[in-house]
UniProtKB/Swiss-Prot annotation:
Its cofactor is Mg(2+). GO terms for cellular component: cytosol. This is Ketol-acid reductoisomerase (NADP(+)). The lineage of its organism: Bacteria, Bacillati, Bacillota, Bacilli, Bacillales. It is an enzyme of class 1 (oxidoreductase). PROSITE patterns: KARI_C (PS51851), KARI_N (PS51850). Its EC number is 1.1.1.86. It comes from Staphylococcus carnosus (strain TM300). Pfam families: KARI_C, KARI_N. Substrate binds at S251. Belongs to the ketol-acid reductoisomerase family. It comes from the Bacteria. NADP(+) binds at Y25, G26, S27, Q28, R48, S52, D82, E83, I84, Q85, G133. Gene3D superfamilies: 6.10.240.10, NAD(P)-binding Rossmann-like Domain (3.40.50.720). Involved in the biosynthesis of branched-chain amino acids (BCAA). Catalyzes an alkyl-migration followed by a ketol-acid reduction of (S)-2-acetolactate (S2AL) to yield (R)-2,3-dihydroxy-isovalerate. In the isomerase reaction, S2AL is rearranged via a Mg-dependent methyl migration to produce 3-hydroxy-3-methyl-2-ketobutyrate (HMKB). In the reductase reaction, this 2-ketoacid undergoes a metal-dependent reduction by NADPH to yield (R)-2,3-dihydroxy-isovalerate.
Length: 334
């Protein structure tokens, strides 16, 4: 049975009187730090000099190199990209942790796959908002919140559970509700969702649909509209009310096609492939591949990225988006 915690069920403020170092000031970092600060907590930022360092200072924070921020803190929230966390932890965080400190993460990758192995005398917990940082911040300022997951990997103090819940409340997540999980469950489900559905699955489905239409002689521009551009319309409907709302909102022709043709595309063989992807996540094969490629300068990663950018759908999309001024208000600035 899933357990969900809300504002009123967080009885103890285990963060009270503690200094929090947020390491990193990117998408999640700025949201966590600003929400915690607005809720009255003592927050410092740990980050290397650069644009994010300057932005954090401009936003009114005391900003330090990572090692100096960690030295001051009781709770250290690590919000850096997965591939650099291990190095930063080893060089700048670990030497400055003290017994009784707490080490926190918004994604369990490096703890679950033993890239980071904290000492036994610190708490280790997870608070993972289920939305990007800009949404975590925006909903907070509007008086609502994004739901989150939380969990405890190591309870050295005997109070790590309350500390994790208090942190979740501190960033505003308990307004919407937070679900208890484990580092293992959060990491494996998150990676699977990204690889099999949200990123890997969807992009391959779209590309294959685009190629099928173009190879059959249809205009690439029409193919783009039908298999990529309109994806947002369908996803928005599912986001708002699940598959039921989506199917209620489309034509009977589209709904009938959904039922009779969907299973021809996503066959039982595809599900077996999904299970193989999940197995590679569970047994560490994917993590080891990612970690090794990172050590080798991401040679395979960059090669795959370049190949993906060379696909015809990229150029067609770029041209068509110039016809759509309504997409000028971008969520992400490159």
């Amino acid at each position: 049975m899933t357990t969900v915690y809300y504002d009123e069920t967080v009885k103890e403020d285990a963060l009270k009187g503690k200094k929090i170092a947020v390491v990193g000031y990117g998408s999640q970092g700025h949201a966590h730090a600003q929400n915690l600060k607005d809720n009255g907590y003592d927050v410092v930022i740990g980050i290397r000099p650069g644009n994010s360092f300057d932005k954090a200072k401009k936003d009114g924070f005391d900003v330090y190199p990572v090692d100096e921020a960690v030295k001051q803190a009781d709770v250290v929230m690590v919000l850096l990209p997965d591939e650099i966390q291990g190095k930063v932890y080893e060089e700048e965080i670990a030497p400055n942790l003290e017994a009784g400190n707490a080490l926190a993460f918004a994604h369990g990758f490096n703890i679950h796959f033993d890239v980071i192995q904290p000492p036994e005398d610190v708490d280790v917990f997870l608070v993972a908002p289920k939305g990007p940082g800009h949404l975590v911040r925006r909903t907070f300022t509007e008086g609502s919140s994004v739901p989150a997951l939380f969990g405890v990997e190591q309870d050295a103090s005997g109070n790590a559970f309350n500390l994790a819940l208090s942190y979740a409340k501190g960033i505003g997540a308990t307004k919407a509700g937070v679900i208890e999980t484990t580092f293992k469950e959060e990491t494996e489900t998150d990676l699977f969702g990204e690889q099999a559905v949200l990123c890997g699955g969807v992009t391959r489905l779209i590309q294959s649909g685009f190629e099928t239409l173009v190879e059959a002689g249809y205009q690439p521009e029409l193919a783009y509209f039908e298999v990529l551009h309109e994806m947002k319309l369908i996803v928005d409907l599912m986001y708002e009310g699940g598959m039921e709302t989506m199917r209620y909102s489309i034509s009977n022709t589209a709904e009938y096609g959904d039922y009779v043709s969907g299973p021809r595309v996503i066959t039982d063989d595809v599900k077996q492939n999904m299970k193989a992807v999940l197995e590679d996540i569970q047994n560490g094969k994917f993590a080891n591949s990612f970690i090794e490629d990172n050590k080798n300068g991401f040679k395979e990663f960059y090669k795959l990225r370049e190949e993906a950018q060379d696909h015809q759908i990229q150029e067609v999309g770029k041209e068509l988006r110039e016809m759509m001024p309504f997409v000028e208000n971008k969520t992400i600035e490159k």
